[in-house]
Amino acid sequence: MTVSFWGGLFALYYVIFMKGSVNVMPDFQKRYVQWFPGHMAKTRRLIKESLNLVDGVVEIVDARIPASSSNPELGAMVKRKPKIVLLNKSDVADSAATSRWIDYYKKQGVTALAVDCRSGRGLNKFIPACKSVLADVLEKNEKKGMAGKSLRFMVVGIPNTGKSSFINRMAGKNKAVVEDRAGVTRSNQWFSCGNGIELLDTPGVLWPKFDDPEVGDKLAFIGSVKDTVTDMEALSCRLLEVLAATHPDMIEERYKITDIDGLQGWEILEKIGKERGFLIKGGEINYERAAAAVCDEFREGKLGRISLELP
């Protein structure tokens, strides 16, 4: 296949900035996936100060990357509180992988539920899980004559894991703002779920530095890092390389392309652009449009049920 002029330029760009063949930008993470706006530092303080108001913690992670989407700093802050982990977006994650994660958490003494907060699937198990996790608190309240006292949970997680969708489902009213982009909820809010459960919603918060570049990659793949601070073309190339190594059949089936084995990300992106007819003046590939399609369709689960990490 003859690579187009623009394809050739993009290939050079990719080699320099993505592969580190020229010592200008040594790795993907340092250039594209580091995002910690000022309000997140404030959020960390608010979470720490609010812990004495709750009995337990609900952490929402992305079922496709449970480890990478769990903020280690939040984990350290809330470790003394009973915790429930919601593996959200499990509808687009590999079900076998999700089952392994649930078993993993169980061995750690943590209750984990596979859910889809937008549709509500799996959330019928949430209230019983709350009462099971805080059975000792319920018993103490009853002995003190406060059997009707609500159990309070703080809801935490990184941006774009589905906290607002969860709150809306459980509160029964569309009170929390829902948008498929990182960094929407910006203040602590209380919501009642009924059944004696109250939830304290908190804004999504990342941590200042991703020590493992692959963690930064994965967070950008699922949209937990704002697209406006990433290079979407470079990001899509990296995503395609990861998926080509693990799920090549899904790429070929979704985009009606073949022979991607051994190709670099930009080459696969070019194939996708041609097949989809993403062209600009002169018949050149519109890489920006192709990149947006790849990232959006992965996030929406249109390539199939994919998990990017196992316990």
Regions found by a protein language model. Give the residues of each.
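Conserved active-site beta-strand-loop modules that form the wall/rim of enzyme catalytic pockets
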Residues: 117, 167, 197-200
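Canonical P-loop GTPase G-domain recognition
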Residues: 93-152
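Short, structured loop/turn "capping" segments at alpha-beta junctions
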Residues: 137-141, 168, 174-180, 246-251
